[in-house]
Amino acid sequence: MKDNVIPAFRRGYRMQWEAAQDSHVVLYPEGMAKLNETAVAILELVDGKQDVAAIVATLDARFPDAGGVGDDVKEFLQSAIEQKWIQCREPE
């Protein structure tokens, strides 16, 4: 995954707090997926404006003791693409 691509939720997909699940979830037309704290930290930055490098930089600053989260963030985003939650576009 290139650092300059910009991830965004696909149409019909969104992340929200679901009180019944007592957690954040990704809602999509066929159902929902319960998210862990790491997934929430990443997906809350997926806004269709920030590129992958900016998301990684924000999380590196937020979690300095993690020793660099870039590979993990990219791996998660790739998984979210495969799950069809998000899509990435090239910068304009």
From Swiss-Prot:
Signal peptide: none
Keyword Protease annotated: no
Keywords, sorted A to Z: PQQ biosynthesis
InterPro entries, per database record: PQQD, PqqD_bac, PqqD_sf
Highest taxon above the source species: Bacteria
Record GO terms (molecular function): quinone binding
GO biological process: pyrroloquinoline quinone biosynthetic process
Keyword match Kinase: no
Pathways involved: Cofactor biosynthesis; pyrroloquinoline quinone biosynthesis
Assembly notes: Monomer. Interacts with PqqE.
Entry function: Functions as a PqqA binding protein and presents PqqA to PqqE, in the pyrroloquinoline quinone (PQQ) biosynthetic pathway.
Record-stated family: Belongs to the PqqD family.
Stated name of the protein: PqqA binding protein
Organismal lineage: Bacteria, Pseudomonadati, Pseudomonadota, Gammaproteobacteria, Enterobacterales
